Swiss-Prot record:
Its main location: cytoplasm. It catalyses: UDP-N-acetyl-alpha-D-muramate + NADP(+) = UDP-N-acetyl-3-O-(1-carboxyvinyl)-alpha-D-glucosamine + NADPH + H(+). InterPro entries: FAD-bd_PCMH, FAD-bd_PCMH-like_sf, FAD-bd_PCMH_sub1, FAD-bd_PCMH_sub2, MurB, MurB_C, MurB_C_sf, Oxid_FAD_bind_N. Pathway: Cell wall biogenesis; peptidoglycan biosynthesis. It is found in: Cytoplasm. Belongs to the MurB family. This is UDP-N-acetylenolpyruvoylglucosamine reductase. NCBIfam families: PRK13903.1. Keywords: Cell cycle, Cell division, Cell shape, Cell wall biogenesis/degradation, Cytoplasm, FAD, Flavoprotein, NADP, Oxidoreductase, Peptidoglycan synthesis. The keyword tRNA processing does not apply. SUPFAM superfamilies: FAD-binding/transporter-associated domain-like (SSF56176), Uridine diphospho-N-Acetylenolpyruvylglucosamine reductase, MurB, C-terminal domain (SSF56194). GO terms for biological process: cell division; cell wall organization; peptidoglycan biosynthetic process; regulation of cell shape. The keyword Cell wall biogenesis/degradation applies.
Length: 372
């Protein structure tokens, strides 16, 4: 990777040619981009994308990938003609009970900052890798909480008009692991709007949000629905995530992943009843708008894909991509995986679950240049 010296064209943003993208993603898979533009401020992001979009209209540019933390991406190794724009604008400010974070801020830093200011509401989202700007796109959630619970508005760049404006959270059409941003992005490359900044309204009482998730309540030894100290909740969440290999650790290949690869499917009540009647023992399920939410990890394991699948023969080579040995929903890079390895394993698991249960799992990460 070498600097191209073209930063002046992008308001001083850093520009590098022949830039490997794999080290910039949590899965550590991806191509060498033709050009990587790293924007350290929102002004650089705006100037860079306006220029690239002008070039696009003139038919003079490569496909453009906009990303930050790289925690929810599977990028095809074949996409070598990319111009990648990395958001590194990372400011975090607190005013009263409002927390504002620029898109490139490390998400867990946002959570910790809120807690250090005595604000509750984000603590269940501790330890989730990635950037603040990505959280509303997926409506990131964990342990009974979602970003949409506390998000008040986002500042976005409309790439069609070039205008920048604040959009209320009520206009973002949030759903389970989705939003208007995700629904409008055809392939993850031609995204019509880019998040520049997010704002959250949090609880200044010194208490957490109500603990809604049974596993977390058990870890805290409190009843479901009770509030607790946000810092204590954060510590419990981090402990739970670490036991599942869901806290990034460069030395642990179980954490080289995009987190849960499949979303928990929501099925019609009669589908759940048929499933419950066809297996021994209880089927984990939860009420959900429009049906019943099933546990994707349970479906994966019951379909024959246990933790660590495929397990290598004694003394034999390890597959380049395996399920985590700690969590059945995490597809992990064991050190040499390429995008084709990840997609092949994901396809095997999806097809296996569909064959056994008649339920099709949907991938949670953004797939760029590849599909199941």
């Amino acid at each position: 990777m070498k600097s191209s010296g073209a930063g002046a064209a992008f308001a001083g943003a850093s520009v590098a040619d022949a830039a490997p993208l794999a080290p910039l993603t949590t899965l550590r898979v991806g191509p060498t981009a033709r050009r990587l533009i790293t924007c350290a401020s929102s002004e650089q992001v705006i100037a860079t994308l306006r220029r690239l979009d002008t070039e696009r209209l003139a038919g003079q540019r490569d496909p453009v990938l906009v990303f930050a933390g790289g925690s929810n991406l599977v990028i095809s190794d074949a996409l070598s003609d990319l111009t990648a724009v990395r958001l590194a604008n990372d400011g975090i400010t607190v005013e009263g009970n409002l927390v504002r974070a620029q898109a490139g801020a490390v998400w867990d830093d946002v959570v910790l900052t809120a807690i250090e200011h005595g604000l509750g509401g984000l603590e269940c989202l501790s330890g989730i890798p990635g950037s603040a700007g990505a959280t509303p796109i997926q409506n990131v959630g964990a342990y009974g909480a979602e970003v949409s619970d506390t998000l008040t508005r986002v500042r976005v760049l409309d790439r069609g008009s070039g205008q920048v404006r604040w959009v209320p959270g009520t206009e973002l059409e949030f759903g389970y692991r989705t939003s208007v941003f995700k629904r409008r992005a055809d392939d993850g490359l031609e995204i019509p709007s880019v998040v520049l900044e997010v704002e959250f309204a949090l609880d200044a009482s010194g208490r957490s949000a109500p603990v809604r998730y049974g596993e977390l309540a058990a870890e805290l030894k409190v009843p479901v629905g009770q509030r607790a100290d946000p810092r204590t909740v954060r510590e419990a969440v981090l402990a739970l995530r670490a036991r599942k290999g869901m806290v990034l650790d460069a030395a642990d290949h179980d954490t080289w992943s995009v987190g849960s690869f499949f979303t928990n499917p929501v099925v019609a009540p009669d589908v759940y009843e048929r499933l419950a009647g066809s297996v021994d023992g209880p089927v984990p399920h939860y009420p959900a708008p429009g049906g019943v939410k099933l546990a994707a990890g349970w479906l994966v394991e019951r379909a024959g894909f246990g933790k660590g699948y495929p397990v290598p023969d004694p003394g034999g080579p390890e597959a380049p991509c395996r399920l985590s040995t700690k969590h059945a929903l995490a597809l992990t890079n064991r050190g040499t995986a390429r995008s084709d390895d990840v997609i092949a394993l994901a396809r095997t698991i999806r097809d296996g679950v569909r064959s056994v249960f008649g339920i099709t799992l949907v991938p949670e990460p953004v797939l760029l240049g590849c599909r199941l």
